[in-house]
Swiss-Prot record:
Full protein name: tRNA N6-adenosine threonylcarbamoyltransferase
Region named Disordered: 341-365
Cellular component terms (Gene Ontology): cytoplasm
Gene3D superfamilies: 3.30.420.40
Keyword DNA damage applies: no
List of residues binding substrate: 141-145, 174, 187, 289
Gene Ontology annotations of biological process type: tRNA threonylcarbamoyladenosine modification
Positions annotated to bind Fe cation: 119, 123, 317
Signal peptide annotation: none
Gene it is expressed from: tsaD
Sample GO molecular function, one term: N(6)-L-threonylcarbamoyladenine synthase activity
Cofactor binding mode and count: Binds 1 Fe(2+) ion per subunit.
UniProt cofactor(s): Fe(2+)
Family as reported in the entry's similarity comment: Belongs to the KAE1 / TsaD family.
């Protein structure tokens, strides 16, 4: 029996307010009818990081207009929807609550079913939205607030192989940019500087490569960079443009080498299951880094595994991924209703021990 489902998704777990409409017909690839994102970079730039209270107020102010714009772009009304999906965690609790309250209001007014979505599941299921790949696949979520290796086995079934025990790589990129006086967000700024630098001039540590597991650590890289910067300033009285470029190149090379080696270990564990179509998918803002993508692509070629990276707009936080993850849950019969609550922490793999630490852009899960 052919069925067409249309869902509205809401996302407000950090510093992006987003709404989107996704539609899927049985047997066909899902289609993004609209995707609206309001960023908050300017609101937080003076503070060196996301301020939860400011973020929550901005979400509350923008969610209604986000929903209106998403419906208008899709050419639909609330009456054309089958359900509403909303990020219910993990994330900054004030922002998550704003989204959940907005979704509950729409559900109460329209009678639409309400479906809570794990923000990380939204990222993890994005490859199925963009490329309709089959389970199981290996997911590397690498962003400002998270870094995890997950085997996606179903819309709500994930096995975590490892993750960061302290800071996320995106947080390390942002801190590096601040230490070197580069613009935020740090990822693009550091990458741009690194293109003109020598990655061999400054040798950064490759954290935890002496361990056989898939866990990562990035806090030590920030400390190493700060010490190198301070030493240069003490010796020369300041940093030249070339000093900055070389520091960025060395730092980025350490991130790439660490991720490639840890991903090699995660892929070997994943491939033990002998998946029919072996695939490594990456998502999160840091996945936009060209050197990281190139390193992972070369690794996948070596291990005869497909490599998939969604478009940048779907790597960073967005509501299309939430709508699609909600659509997958909807098809399993999941409904949450008014009992849905916001959750600051929400691990995808409940059987794995908790990861240590909390990133600048939200709690680790």
């Amino acid at each position: 029996m052919t069925q067409t489902l249309t869902l509205l998704g809401l996302e407000s777990s950090c510093d992006d307010t987003a709404a989107a409409v996704v539609r899927q017909t049985t047997g066909a690839k899902a289609e993004i009818l609209s995707s609206i994102v309001f960023g908050q970079t300017e609101l937080h730039s003076a503070y060196g990081g996301v301020v939860p209270e400011i973020a929550a107020r901005a979400h509350a102010e923008k969610l209604d207009s986000c929903v209106r714009d998403a419906l208008a772009e899709a050419g639909l009304t609330l009456g054309d929807l089958d359900a509403i999906a909303v990020t219910a965690g993990p994330g900054l609790i004030g922002g998550v609550m704003s989204g959940v309250m907005c979704a509950k209001g729409i559900s109460a007014a329209t009678g639409l079913p309400l479906i809570g979505v794990n923000h990380l599941a939204g990222h993890a299921l994005t490859p199925r939205l963009t490329d309709d790949i089959t389970y199981p696949y290996l997911m590397l979520l690498v962003s400002g607030g998270h870094c995890q290796y997950l085997i996606a086995r179903g819309p709500e079934t994930f096995s975590r192989l490892g993750g960061t025990i302290d800071d996320a790589p995106g947080e390390a990129f942002d801190k590096t940019a601040r230490l070197l006086g580069l613009p935020q967000p740090g990822g693009p700024s550091v990458q741009a500087e690194a293109e003109h630098g020598d990655p061999e001039r400054f040798r950064f540590p490759r954290p935890l490569l002496d361990r056989p597991d898939c866990n990562l650590s990035f806090s030590g890289l920030k400390t190493a960079l700060m010490r190198m910067r301070d030493q240069i300033i003490a010796e020369k009285g300041g940093l030249t443009r070339q000093d900055r470029a070389d520091l960025c190149a060395g730092f980025q090379a350490a991130i790439v080498d660490t991720l490639v080696e840890k991903t090699r270990r995660a892929l070997r564990l994943y491939l033990e299951d002998k998946p029919q179509h072996p695939t490594l998918a990456v998502a999160g803002g840091v996945a936009a880094n060209t050197e990281i993508r190139n390193g992972l692509m070369a690794l996948c070629f070596e291990l005869e595994t497909d490599f998939l990276a969604p478009p940048l707009a779907l790597c960073t936080d967005n509501a299309a991924m939430i709508a699609y993850a909600g659509l997958e849950r909807y098809k399993t019969g999941a409904r949450d209703g008014m009992s849905l609550s916001a959750r600051p922490r929400w691990p995808l793999d409940k059987t794995s021990p908790a990861l240590i630490g909390s990133g600048k852009k939200g709690a680790k899960a």
